[in-house]
A protein has these predicted regions:
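Short, solvent-exposed loop/turn segments at secondary-structure junctions
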Residues: 3-5, 16, 51-54, 88-92, ...
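RNase H-like polynucleotidyl transferase catalytic core
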Residues: 13, 70-75, 149-170, 184-185
Length: 190
């Protein structure tokens, strides 16, 4: 069939990645052991992460004729949308959307708003919740840590390259697998 349609593909090279360095493996193992311990003690894990959306079609490649382009036409979103998400082990999800770049101040604002929402939805939540965060600079910043401490919530950072243990990454992956604006509504200020 490939020959009939004049299709071809390129074999991808395997890249050497730091994900399997001894340090990364040990840190992931320690992180995994700590997570299992918290789950055994019925801690609620709240995965907080962020992404941004600058287009509505995330389909990157398509089959094409040998001399044709395999790229798809992108549908831009301008200005881009920043999304901060929190999802807990019970499946509750909280979103914040903005046009601002995510930084320590935006993370602090999100955490304050999140705890206000959780005060009404989950009384006594701070006794049982641990925030799981990746190692982004604004997650590690002193400002963010001070806010989390002031809110009385525990914090754990994931091990390096631990995407598969962060449920927010799966949520973002599901969002970014296809066309999120199938009706092609306007997505720019112009």
């Amino acid at each position: 069939m490939k020959k009939e349609l004049h299709l071809s593909f390129l074999k991808a090279k395997k890249l050497n990645h730091q994900a399997n360095s001894e340090r990364a493996l040990i840190l992931r193992q320690q992180y995994g052991m700590k997570m299992l311990e918290m789950l055994q003690h019925n801690r609620r894990i709240l995965n907080v992460d962020e992404t941004w959306v600058n287009e509505t079609s995330f389909i990157r490649r398509a089959w094409a004729k040998r001399d044709g382009s395999g790229n798809t036409i992108l549908s831009r979103v301008s200005p881009r949308i920043s999304m901060i998400t929190a999802i807990d082990t019970d499946g509750r999800v909280w979103f914040a959307l903005s046009h601002a770049n995510t930084d320590s101040k935006m993370m602090a604002l999100f955490l304050h708003s999140l705890t206000e929402a959780m005060d009404t939805e989950i009384p006594g939540y701070s006794d049982s919740i641990t925030i799981l965060s990746d190692n982004a600079k604004y997650h590690q910043s002193q400002e963010t840590r001070d806010v989390i401490k002031a809110l009385g919530i525990r914090l754990i950072f994931s091990g390096p390259y631990s995407y598969s243990s962060a449920v927010a990454e799966y949520l973002f992956g599901g969002l970014k697998t296809s066309e999120i604006n199938p009706d092609h509504l306007p997505t720019t200020k112009r």
